[in-house]
Amino acid sequence: MMKSALAFAAILAATLVLPGHAQDAMKKDTAVKPAPSPSQAVLESWNDAGRKLTAMAEDFPEDKYDFKPTPAQRGFAEQLLHATNANYYFTSLALGQKPPAEEDPKRDQFKTKADVVAFVKKSFADGAAAIKAKGDKGMSELVVDPGSHQQMRLSDLAYGLIEHDGEHYGQLAVYYRVAGLVPPESRPKK
């Protein structure tokens, strides 16, 4: 009984002491990074959404670009065209231009995988350039969302479209799985 109590005490002591030493080591090795500026935070999120959708656009087999999990859904390429075309609601307003038409680009306008990939990349590059050009002050400007006709900050519109891109990323991850493939973000890191 005494040996069990001593063993328990030793384990308890180690459990309480070791995490403290690990935390002290972490505190010494890592300095706190400053928070990004508001426009930098938007840019980082925008670029992350773009990286994920671009990786999917580049990775998905071209012979499956019109794949639909069910007949009622958009094809893989149509999902990408819809999501990335919507980015221009932000970009056009940020640059003082007219927003794109309500309808999605037609698949026959983007006949090849390379055409779709180029559109995805350009959409995110144009948005990133607009965010950089606007900076913190410009991203705080008030605009009217063409869809809801509600006034909002330009940064809020950008975040709304980042969220929209995330929704379509999630849908496309399902397309991958139904097609028997593994999405790039779900693969083991090399």
Model-inferred region functions:
Residues 1-5:
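Positively charged n-region of N-terminal signal peptides that target proteins for export
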Residues 7-19:
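Bacterial N-terminal signal peptides
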Residues 27-40:
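N-terminal low-complexity, Pro/Thr/Ser-rich intrinsically disordered segments
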Residues 43-47, 54, 64-105, 142-190:
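Short, contiguous alpha-helical
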Residues 44-48, 52, 118-126:
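A non-catalytic, amphipathic alpha-helix used as a structural packing/dimerization or gating element
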Residues 85-89, 129, 133-136:
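Glycine-rich, acidic and aromatic/proline-enriched surface loops and short helix-turn segments
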Residues 100-123:
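Helix-adjacent hinge/juxtasegments
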